[in-house]
Amino acid sequence: NYMQEPSSSAAATFTDDSIQKCLNPLRSVNHEPPKDCSVYIGVDPALGSNNCVIAATPHEGKLKILFIREDLGLTRNEQILGIVEEAVLQCGRNGSSVSDVIIEAMVFQKGLSRDERLIEMTQRYGFRVREHLTGMNKYDETIGVPSMALSFMRGDIEIPYADDPSTRHQADQLIRQLKAWRPLKRGTKLRQDQVMALWFIWILYRQRKQSFALDTSQFNYKGLPWGSTMPARQVF
């Protein structure tokens, strides 16, 4: 159990209290998505190390994580794309479907997000691919990972935490990374692939939530790390 592990909470971006607010003991990663929902998938791709996929849906005023998948030691882009397709199919139950797949597009991943097989998948399943361009923006207090902490404090993000082995394993891995995350600590020294994949989804969730609450002509999209050239007004 993650709560039994020591941590230096003084400098934590994501505190035990805020994480605790987001745990749902009645939801399992084995449950179907809520009925007729749009699902977002965040992908932090990696060959040789930790490849992470997270699926979440905006539902009942929260961003609800459906499941987290991590694979080690992948050697080919085809394997990553196969995992993405499996995630899309897993989310396509109970009348729900994937609307957006957000993929880190720095360095080698740029080729992945523009792979013909992925483009063919978008045509088959009807989702849009977004390239996420991570740089120093992940430390930004208004759009970076630290800004996601407020959603945890408010309980706006839901982590499944039913008492079954799959759910606890997936949730506890994410929670460990959240508790350990610190600004300006390099990913080579700190595991953060799951935090990154969740952040990709959360940015889109926040962007859409705010655009519904505000007149979009007044909303400032500056700083959003999308590689897409699609105007914001056409996203929704």
Q: How would you describe each model-predicted region?
A:
Residues N1-V43:
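ATPase catalytic-site recognition across NTP-hydrolyzing enzymes
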Residues N1-E5, A11-I19, E104, I159-S166, ...:
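Short coil/turn segments at secondary-structure boundaries
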Residues A11, T15, W199-F236:
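Acidic two-metal-ion nuclease catalytic site recognized across multiple nuclease folds
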Residues D36, L47-S49, N77, E141, ...:
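Active-site-proximal structural scaffolding
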Residues G48-N50, S96, R208:
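A cross-taxa feature marking solvent-exposed loop/turn segments within ectodomains of secreted
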Residues N1-Y2, P6, R176-Q218:
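P-loop NTPase motor core of the ASCE superfamily
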Residues P33-H59:
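Gly/Thr-rich phosphate-binding beta-strand-loop-beta motif of the actin/hexokinase/Hsp70
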Residues S9, E60-W181, A232-F236:
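Mg2+-dependent endonuclease catalytic cores in nucleic-acid-processing enzymes, primarily RNase H-like
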